[in-house]
């Protein structure tokens, strides 16, 4: 597993000018975080993770792919406001839409970071690398394919420092019905 981006020993006056696209498989990452945290109310903290992933490189695009139509409007607004990102609802799995978007971006960016541990992306990683794109994976280690990690140029481990847990919502009370 590659655990160094190479920036640790870089002289201070050297600036790496890379354009980065981040593609998030929301369902895969959410499920991995919920399993690792043991809590369905745990959520990815983009404000800590995105700067860590970028490592002083420039963010070109951010896409969050998620199955289903029930996507938080707060998440949409936050990603758009802070990262000019967009949320892409998917009919079923995010695999195909994320792959298509990655192929469209391949000649527009230097690096693509895929936030998913799904082995379905192995062939995509291989293809992007043949196109000259640096491909990095960010995921929860326990839910990540070792083959995907081996094929990538770099692996970022998503840890408990990269998510937070919301308190559970209190149950909604039904109004008391007055009897005549």
Question: Where is each model-derived feature located?
Answer:
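Nuclease catalytic cores that cleave nucleic-acid phosphodiester bonds
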Residues: 68-180
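Domain-level signal for Mg2+-assisted phosphodiester chemistry and nucleotide/NA-binding surfaces
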Residues: 2-96, 104-107, 134
């Amino acid at each position: 597993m590659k655990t160094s981006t190479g920036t640790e020993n870089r002289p201070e006056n050297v600036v790496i000018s890379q354009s980065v696209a981040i593609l998030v498989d929301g369902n895969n990452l959410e499920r991995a975080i919920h399993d690792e945290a043991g809590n369905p109310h745990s959520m990815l903290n983009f404000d800590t993770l995105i700067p860590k992933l970028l490592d002083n490189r420039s963010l070109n695009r951010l896409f969050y792919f998620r199955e289903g139509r029930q996507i938080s409007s707060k998440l949409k607004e936050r990603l758009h406001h802070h990262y000019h990102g967009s949320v892409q609802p998917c009919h079923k799995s995010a695999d195909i839409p994320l792959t298509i978007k990655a192929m469209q971006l391949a000649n527009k960016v230097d690096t693509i970071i895929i936030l998913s541990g799904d082995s379905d992306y192995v062939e995509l990683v291989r293809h992007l690398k043949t196109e000259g794109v640096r491909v990095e994976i960010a995921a929860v280690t326990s839910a990540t394919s070792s083959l995907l990690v081996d094929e990538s140029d770099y692996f970022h481990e998503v840890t408990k420092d990269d998510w937070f847990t919301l308190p559970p919502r209190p149950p909604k009370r039904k109004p008391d019905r007055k009897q005549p």
